[in-house]
């Protein structure tokens, strides 16, 4: 129905708006949109897909995000933030996932097991399978005074504060130009400062509005820290893996192999890197760990030789990591999307997989083309055309 399409589009829009962090995205979009989509008979599996498809794919192409900070931290000997920006047009999996999701929602089409879930939801069964996680749970109502502003204000404040924080870390307030300050910023420092001040402002805002008292707001902080512990551990282990591969000389070994490869075979390297990243992220369930292993190898392989090919290959690594993470049943983001939608986890994985495979195949084809043309536009147009077909 028209109401269902509108609800899905609002879910997508909210997911795109919350690009700072994928955990924050999954939990916020899920808790906000779940009562609305339930009311208009959107299956929990479809909601989980919409949440998951606007989490990592949005964060990996957003310069102001925890993912950008993680990626730039793995790029050594180069301007990590500048490379991240240049890699965005080549991040085909993320771009095609967002495009495919919008097309699916706008045209109201589904295929595979998702079509079964949506057909059952139209009859009032939002779960399809007997397992109904949180079926008897009641939605937490914190205060009756809550308004739309209470949701939008913290998000907008967080984005603005993070931008200011990144400009500050890039010495913008010491006379450096806007673009130079942004490209020369330390994303991790900027996000940390921005998040801290956004938290303070939000606590004061809620206290003034009498939505949450100071004590109630402060009691939420430990819960927030707990939610981020898995991400902190993943990043720590990713850095450990990076140090181990560095010690083993993996970068030099791969660089030596690639230098012996002739031009034609070199052009398909981005597609190979994409596939390796997909399988590595799928097996480990972590895209950040995949970044930590592959990005330093890619940088050392192409550094000082073919800068464009390095950017395409780094982007292929990021896209493949997100793709593998997207369909892995042990991925933290996939688990968070299931939790946000309160959907059976394996239902979410099985219904999302056909969509992921279609976009992954198209992305792999576009990386083969990108390796030869070394231009982001032509493969992008071809990929979008294939999605539309």
Over which residues does each language-model region extend?
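C-terminal transmembrane helix pair
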Residues: 229-233, 237-241, 245, 262-291, ...
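Long, contiguous bundles of hydrophobic transmembrane helices that form the permeation core
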Residues: 97-184, 196-220, 340, 344-353, ...
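Interfacial loop-to-helix junctions that mark the boundaries of transmembrane helices
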Residues: 83-91, 176-194, 259-264, 372-381
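Short amphipathic alpha-helical coupling elements at transmembrane boundaries
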Residues: 31-39, 49, 86, 216-227, ...
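Juxtamembrane and boundary regions of transmembrane helices in multi-pass small-molecule transporters
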Residues: 58-137, 318-387
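Alpha-helical transmembrane segments of multi-pass membrane proteins
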Residues: 6-20, 30, 40-67, 81-99, ...
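Short, small-residue-biased leader/transition segments that mark boundaries at the very start
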Residues: 2-5, 389
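Core transmembrane alpha-helical segments of multi-pass membrane transporters/permeases
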Residues: 1, 16, 146-155, 160, ...
């Amino acid at each position: 129905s028209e109401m269902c399409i509108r609800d899905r589009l609002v879910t997508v829009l909210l997911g795109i708006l919350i690009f700072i962090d994928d955990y924050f995205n999954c939990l916020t979009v899920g808790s906000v949109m779940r009562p609305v989509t339930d009311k208009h008979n959107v299956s929990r599996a479809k909601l989980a897909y919409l949440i998951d498809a606007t989490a990592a794919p949005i964060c990996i192409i957003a310069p102001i995000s925890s993912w950008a900070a993680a990626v730039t931290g793995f790029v050594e000997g180069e301007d990590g933030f500048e490379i991240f920006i240049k890699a965005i047009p080549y991040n085909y999996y993320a771009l095609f996932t967002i495009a495919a999701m919008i097309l699916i929602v706008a045209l109201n089409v589904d295929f595979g097991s998702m079509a079964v879930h949506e057909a059952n939801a139209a009859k009032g069964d939002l779960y399809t399978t007997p397992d109904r996680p949180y079926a008897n749970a009641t939605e937490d109502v914190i205060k009756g005074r809550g308004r739309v502003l209470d949701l939008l204000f913290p998000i907008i404040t967080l984005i603005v504060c993070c931008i200011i924080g990144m400009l500050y870390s890039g010495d913008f307030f010491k006379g450096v130009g806007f673009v130079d300050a942004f490209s020369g910023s330390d994303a991790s420092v900027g996000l940390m400062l921005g998040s801290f001040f956004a938290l303070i402002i939000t606590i004061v805002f809620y206290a003034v509005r009498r939505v949450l008292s100071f004590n109630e707001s402060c009691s939420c902080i430990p819960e927030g820290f707990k939610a981020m512990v898995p991400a902190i551990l993943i990043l720590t282990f990713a850095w450990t893996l990076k140090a181990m591969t560095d010690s083993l000389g993996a970068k030099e070994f791969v660089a030596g192999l690639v230098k012996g490869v002739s031009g034609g075979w070199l052009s398909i390297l981005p597609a190979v890197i994409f596939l390796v990243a997909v399988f590595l992220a799928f097996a480990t369930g972590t895209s950040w760990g995949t970044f930590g292993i592959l990005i330093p190898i890619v940088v050392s392989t192409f550094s000082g030789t073919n800068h464009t090919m390095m950017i395409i290959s780094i982007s292929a690594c990021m896209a493949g990591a997100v793709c593998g993470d997207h369909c892995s049943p042990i991925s933290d983001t996939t688990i968070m999307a299931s939790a946000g939608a309160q959907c059976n986890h394996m239902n979410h994985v099985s219904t999302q997989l056909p969509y992921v495979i279609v976009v992954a195949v198209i992305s792999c084809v576009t990386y083969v083309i990108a390796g030869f043309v070394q231009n982001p536009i032509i493969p992008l147009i071809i990929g979008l055309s294939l999605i539309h077909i």
